[in-house]
């Protein structure tokens, strides 16, 4: 079956001497894996395709999908838009690598989800186009991503003035520390109340130190880890932590 779809590059891994495997998130088919020629000797189109397989590149692809196969072939591909600033700017590129790694871990199903795809594509365009401080971009992305994933926590105190713990497993505030030992203590759970309002447009108003920003990120990732297991350790947050004061 031939499919035509927009698709976002998540990850590329070595497969054998002839091919690598590109993992893409497509608008029409969800997560799909494609064999990508590793050498231009396999034809001009193979060499051109290899150059397009870069994290968060959005492509328009024509691909051949065969039933009962996990690996497919891309017949044609072209960039939907040029993200030159993401490629050339170290800060944007580091954020892009984090987003790509995160999405690679959580987007696992070969099922179309157009709302989720459109949010991710919109976010990539924002990363390319925005000017000014970018330190909170990844936090805004992770908070907003909860909406299309259907993982929105209950961040209301329910009228209580008593400081409460946040239980990431249940996605709500609770009066005592959760038994699993990974609850967010009352003096830090206020971050969640604050950040539930964050967007790409207002994220510059959220002023955090490097340590506070990393703490919020760790709490967010742990929330995802509870709700989308299995969830291995991320490699890219340490890079982000060195970029922003």
Swiss-Prot record:
Keywords: DNA damage, DNA recombination, DNA repair. SUPFAM superfamilies: ArfGap/RecO-like zinc finger (SSF57863), Nucleic acid-binding proteins (SSF50249). The keyword Cell cycle does not apply. One of its GO terms (cellular component) is bacterial nucleoid. InterPro entries: ARFGAP/RecO (IPR037278), DNA_rep/recomb_RecO_N (IPR022572), NA-bd_OB-fold (IPR012340), RecO (IPR003717), RecO_C (IPR042242). Involved in DNA repair and RecF pathway recombination. This is DNA repair protein RecO. It comes from Porphyromonas gingivalis (strain ATCC 33277 / DSM 20709 / CIP 103683 / JCM 12257 / NCTC 11834 / 2561). The gene is recO.
């Amino acid at each position: 079956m031939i499919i035509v779809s927009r698709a976002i590059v998540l990850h590329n891994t070595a497969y054998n001497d002839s091919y690598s495997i590109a993992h893409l998130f497509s608008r029409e088919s969800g997560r799909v894996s494609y064999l990508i020629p590793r050498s231009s000797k396999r034809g001009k189109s193979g060499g051109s395709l290899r150059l397009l397989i870069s994290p968060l590149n959005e492509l328009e692809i024509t691909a051949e999908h065969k039933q009962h196969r996990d690996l497919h072939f891309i017949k044609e591909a072209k960039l939907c838009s040029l993200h030159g600033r993401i490629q050339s700017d170290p800060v944007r590129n580091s954020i892009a690598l984090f987003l790509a790694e995160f999405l690679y871990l959580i987007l696992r199903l070969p099922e179309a989800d157009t709302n989720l795809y459109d949010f991710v594509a919109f976010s990539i365009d924002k990363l390319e186009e925005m000017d000014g401080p970018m330190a909170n971009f990844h936090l805004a992305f992770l908070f907003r991503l909860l909406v299309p994933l259907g993982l929105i926590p209950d961040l209301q105190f329910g009228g209580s003035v008593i400081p409460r713990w946040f239980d990431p497993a249940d996605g709500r505030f609770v009066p005592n520390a959760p038994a699993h030992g990974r609850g967010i203590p009352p003096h830090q759970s206020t971050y969640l109340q604050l950040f539930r309002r964050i967007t790409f447009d207002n994220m510059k108003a959220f002023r955090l130190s490097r340590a506070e920003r990393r703490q919020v990120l760790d709490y967010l990732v742990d929330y995802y880890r509870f709700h989308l297991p299995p969830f291995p350790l991320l490699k890219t947050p340490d890079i982000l932590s060195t970029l922003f004061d």
